[in-house]
């Protein structure tokens, strides 16, 4: 890494912590329902909504009722998104006259946006009408993010509660998160994006002449309400682009400043939730330990991917091409990257979007060096707990914290405890389910895709790189990331259905056992700290937590990674 990359990383982390701390205080207030008096008019509107829907906001839910409400809410959301896509040809706000989307693609997209994955097998500018973008995809960008944060709130309440049968009210949580967190942040961020040149309109596509004049063919420029969707796309760690090029498109991400702000937006709520966690459990040091573990793993990932991309292709270096960055060139591997961002900003964006469950891209991960592309892939496969998605990153890391204290308990022969709650067989069974669901979906799905006749047909490249494209797709879907090695032609009935299954169970097959853990912990008494209690706020626990995350990730995925990016790297090195 050069000095520019180090400075960029340092400024990014400093601004992130500066912004996440006050947001954490606000998130804690929203979780507890302690809203300031100045919001009384909004609170009255909120109360009216509950009354109209027949919801008693004062009644808490057990984990089973919470889970059923969540599943029903998201299932209805998926049906609505599916129907809007199928019917868009006869609906308004469709100036290009785009027809209804096919059944398999509609199903894939509905599951994708409801599960906060935002995998896109289609090109937005040639497939989706403005109404579908706004009413189907845009709405789910808010609701899927609110669902993830609600689950995180429920798990935090499980740790903080004392002999309680309730973990909150799902309908209240989703409403408050949407109204008091996601909407205000998105509104402010959308205005900023418009100031940077992100478009926001409902005009028909524009035909323009290029600089060549009459000798050239007119070019069609896609229009649309981009800024409003771009804001929640980042803040909600959704990642689904309005355009096919996602955040590499100048209408989505026009300037280096907008690029930096989008990176901050991705991590803002995940980092804020860690601070909120410390406040809600009554010990800010607990949140600090989780934050330290996340930051260490994130910095290691950024340094690795940036260094590998800056080094460039070894065969080009052998031909005398200068790979060193200078005032006149970016150096390194610029394939698939935007000149206005360069290697450092592209590598940092790649690490951020895959550490979080965002999946937005400002460069093509498929064009990264073999080991450079392995870094974002591994970040996805670790379960996206390095800050992670909104809500999902925190509850995923808390599951690993439970695993870490269990391992420590085995080493010292003591019943494990975390935040005063005994970790017993039921919690460990649910923890095992959470940890094993996504690797099972990713690896089994990859095996199915490789052995089915229609699976390898979608590979854009032969050999280990084509295999990595499939592994990346299934890992991304199962872990609800949504980014891709885009050389894979995935908009086929086979991949649309396979990836939809991975996305649905990768999301809700994790959420349900997490809520079960929350319900079990909430019912327990909170034990006092004794001399035999493992401190979970110091550097020793941070190291133990990092070890648990890396150990599980490596044991699950290293054999699969060895067949893809590692083999490709060795083949590339041997060809010098």
From Swiss-Prot:
Keywords: Cell inner membrane, Cell membrane, Ion transport, Membrane, Potassium, Potassium transport, Transmembrane, Transmembrane helix, Transport
Keyword Phosphoprotein: no
InterPro entries referenced in this protein's UniProt entry, alphabetically: KdpA
Pfam families: KdpA
CC annotations in GO: plasma membrane
Family membership: Belongs to the KdpA family.
Self-association state and partner proteins as the record states: The system is composed of three essential subunits: KdpA, KdpB and KdpC.
Purpose: Part of the high-affinity ATP-driven potassium transport (or Kdp) system, which catalyzes the hydrolysis of ATP coupled with the electrogenic transport of potassium into the cytoplasm. This subunit binds the periplasmic potassium ions and delivers the ions to the membrane domain of KdpB through an intramembrane tunnel.
Name of the protein: Potassium-transporting ATPase potassium-binding subunit
Protein species of origin: Methylibium petroleiphilum (strain ATCC BAA-1232 / LMG 22953 / PM1)
Lineage per the UniProt record: Bacteria, Pseudomonadati, Pseudomonadota, Betaproteobacteria, Burkholderiales
